Swiss-Prot record:
Keywords: Cytoplasm. GO terms for molecular function: copper ion binding. Residues 205-226 are annotated as: Disordered. The gene is cutC. This is PF03932 family protein CutC. It is found in: Cytoplasm. PANTHER family: COPPER HOMEOSTASIS PROTEIN CUTC, COPPER HOMEOSTASIS PROTEIN CUTC HOMOLOG. It comes from the Bacteria. Belongs to the CutC family. InterPro entries: CutC-like, CutC-like_dom_sf. Residues 205-222 have a biased composition (Polar residues). Transmembrane segments: none annotated. It comes from Vibrio atlanticus (strain LGP32). One of its GO terms (cellular component) is cytoplasm.
Amino acid sequence: MNTEIEVCIDNLESLYNALSGGANRIELCSSLALGGLTPSFGMMKQAAKISSVPVYAMIRPRQGDFIFDYDDILCMLEDIEACARAGVNGVVLGVLTPDGEIDMSAMQILSSKAHQLKLAITFHRAIDQLQDYKVPLEQIIELGCERILTSGLAINAEQGINVLADMVKQADGRIDIMAGAGVNATNAKMIQSTTQVPALHLSGKSTRPSLMESNSSAQMGSNDVDDYQIPVTDANKISNVRAALTA
């Protein structure tokens, strides 16, 4: 099996690095430190121009849970239309109810819009906030999604391997199960061979120093964030995962 590697990024420098490392697909976000939010139209358009592999844009209007109200859904619909105008290949989304189930009415609205615009859909790790996956997996298939990104309902994919394997069996080729969260060169082959997932998802994150000299004590945001350290994908971390899979 030729395992796909999807790399999540939140800047264009990381896009170049992910491509250099051998990514098969890009999940384009803003604010990966918050779990990934919707990228700007300009970023989507530029990424679509640059990328030699499919680009899927995150549709998530805010950080926090995946319970979205009427205004949020309207915003998400506009963002899906922006994705089509920008030229990306797909969208990444998920909506839940307060009871911890998939919000099928909201998802039907969003997925219908995406399908109408010829955009493929990945249902993201919102599924990992549910108590069980069996019924939700069937619902996601019913919605016409292409794949599910999941850690197997665990804190990371390595700890979720048993559920991931069961999800692959239940899916039975009707939808791709993509393992994500904590995937790296050390555990990638074990996760893939144990679960038989066709795809792995990671950021390959690292940091680089700012090109600007630090000459101020002012902070642009949280004091926990160093404005002079830029988070970027490390191309070597991506290529090392590829090498581990083929070893």
